[in-house]
Amino acid sequence: MLMRSVCFILLAVLLFSLSACEPSHQQQKQASAAKDEKKDIIPLSAEKADGAEGWLNNSTILYTASNPTKTELFAYRIFTGKAKKLYQTDGQIVDVQINAREQMILLQITHSQKTAVVLLNAEGETLYEKDYETYELEAAWNQYDPYQMMVTEFNENWDFHTYQVNAKKDESFLSPVQVPFIHWTSKNTFDYVKEGRDDKTGPLYTFDTASKTEQKLEDNVLFFDSFHQMSFTVKSASGGKGTYQFKTPQSTSPVTAKWPLQAKYTSLAPMEYDYDEAGGLFYTFKQSGDAYKLAAINVASGETKDLVSLREMEPIQISPNGKYALYGFHFEQIILLKSHETKQLIIDQKEME
């Protein structure tokens, strides 16, 4: 009986200790998040950087720097100010895509009337490289399998040929689907809009590279894009707005939101946008008087929230943890999405002195 009482007392003490530790652990997480928000961002000199290219991880961005003889790609830690050169070329880096999840980088480099597609790991080691003699080039990179891509060559008349590339096997062959712009939706599938009668909307199709089958999904699609585990379509609506339909693996039916469109070239298109997979939030803009409001749409519920007012609508890119947004045509600013503060990432040398 005494032994049973002692065991009961020890068990009660143990449970109390565990319950006491839980709030402390939660407080530590909250304190860590608050500390993360208060970290100072150490800016880059505009004399050193042409512009930022995107997030490699939550605290590291990539940027390019060039002179008449070379272009270099650097990884830059925004909270420590430390930079590391990853890659150098005699040509010009014209496009940088980053797969933060797989820690891989895809470059397009122009040199001597050729465009090279170069695949790197996060240390800057070359995994694949191929030259194309082309007037213009489009590379659709598979975010699910970063060794797969669809490369489209354009000539001066904008005629094109599209090739499916397996970088791991160093294979390239003519794609059975000859469309210039595709969007990967899984390791083996991609979706695309075929031109419609008015050249502004068209039917949306999906193609399975494993089974070599094509399937029509829906009609009258104005715009389509995809991210990892999320895709969306836009259809025209009245009053300069579009009907957005968001799809995720968790959704049983598309989540719909009406949102303003912008006039782009000869058609309507979405405002600048990006997607935060961690938070399930689609970030975009809407005009508000002479300014623009950055807003977030929850792709699971369709709920929207205005975040911050900005003078211009410019490209944005959300960090993998959803805490920060690169903003600007050269990603020269960072928006802290919790406090809505805007910090300068790239500044003139005079401002640094």
UniProtKB/Swiss-Prot annotation:
Gene that this polypeptide is encoded by: yqgU
Descriptive protein name: Uncharacterized lipoprotein YqgU
Organism: Bacillus subtilis (strain 168)
Lipidation (S-diacylglycerol cysteine): 21
UniProt-listed InterPro entries: YqgU_beta-prop
Signal peptide: 1-20
Bilayer disposition of the protein: Lipid-anchor
Keywords: Cell membrane, Lipoprotein, Membrane, Palmitate, Signal
Localisation per UniProt entry: Cell membrane
Lipid attachment in record (N-palmitoyl cysteine): 21
Matching SUPFAM superfamilies: DPP6 N-terminal domain-like
Pfam families in the record: YqgU
Keyword Nucleotidyltransferase: no
Cellular component, GO, one term: plasma membrane
